[in-house]
Amino acid sequence: MPANDAAPESSRPFDLIAFDLDGTVFASPNNQLVSPRVYAALQAAHDSGALVAVASGRPLWMIGEQIPEAPWLDYAITCNGARVVGTRRSDLDFSHSIPRPLAEKLLALITEYGGTGSIHTDVESLMEKRHCEKIAQDLAERDAKTDDAAAHSGSPTSNEGRGNPIDAVLSLFSGSGVDSMLDAFLARPTQQLDKVDCTMPSSDSADKLIAKLTELGGIGIARMDAKTPEFTSAAASKGAALVELCRRLGIVPSRAVAFGDSGNDLSMCGRGITFVAMGNATAEVKAAADDQTDTVWEDGVATWLEPRLGISAPEASA
C-alpha cells in the first residue's frame, strides 16, 4: 500500500485524505490559513501513514503559501480536478485541459450570453476586471457573514481594508487583469485552458448558457449558485481526479475520505469515497454526503478526524 509508509495500513483509518479550501479549511477567502487545530489533525493523519491532498477549484498558485509548504501535503488536485500535481514527486502528475477549439467556443459563448469571468490556464490566471469587481463584492459579503459566524464560534477572521477592489482581488488571487478573457486567451496560443470561473447576469442567462454548453458537449459544469457556474473539461472533476489518484497510487477508494461544502465538491460523492459535508455546507451537499461534521469556524475537519485518529484537540495557547 503506497501511503507514506509511516505506519502499517492496519493501524490507520484511511490511506488518503482530501479536503476543499474555501468553506472547508479556509473560513474566508481573504484569510488563506488553516487553523492550528486543523493543521495538527492533518499532520497527525500524515504521521499515521495517510497521504493528504488538497482538492480545490483554485489553481496551485492561488491556494496560499501555508498549504503548499505544509510537511503533510502530498498532492494538489486543482482547478476542479483539471490538473493534479505531486508536491513531493511528479511522476503521478496528470491533467485534463479543455481542447483549444472548444475552449475558444466556450469563452465566446460566455461573452455572448453576457457573462464575465476568469480563466485559469496551465501557467497563469487571467481575470476580467469586471469579474474582479464582482468578486470583491462577494468577498465583502462573505466576510460580513464570516465575522458574524466567528463571533459565535470564537474563531478569528481577517477583514482588513484592501484599497482598490480590482487590485486587491488580483493580488489576493495572484491573477493578471484583462479586459476580455477571450481576447487574452487568443493572444496566448500555446496555453492550455484548465478552468473558467464565470458570473452570469441572471439565473436565466446561466440556464441558457448551460443548456447551450450541454448541447455542445465536452464541457464539465459545476454550479456554485444560480448565477455562478464553473467550467472544465468534461473529463475533469474533483471526484474523477480523486478516484484516478487512488488508482495510480493503488489505494482502494473506500480507504479515502474527502471533505467539502459546495457545488464543486459534489463530484466526490457516490464514488466509494467517504464524503463528509461541513456543517456550513449547502443543503444539496449535506443531502449527498456520507457523513457530516462541524462548520469550518468550528474546525470541522479536525473534529471529524480526531476521534478516528485517536487524538485529542491541541490545548489552546494562553
Language model: regions and residue ranges:
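Mg2+-dependent phosphoryl-transfer enzymes with acidic/Ser/Thr/Gly-rich catalytic loops
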Residues: 2, 8-16, 35, 214, ...
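Active-site T/S-Asp motif of two-component receiver
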Residues: 19
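Active-site phosphate-binding/coordination module
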Residues: 36-159
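Short active-site oxyanion
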Residues: 48-53, 73-74, 195, 254-256, ...
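Short, structured coil segments at secondary-structure junctions
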Residues: 69-72, 79-80, 216-217, 271-272, ...
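Conserved acidic, metal-coordinating active-site core of Asp-based
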Residues: 113-116, 120-257
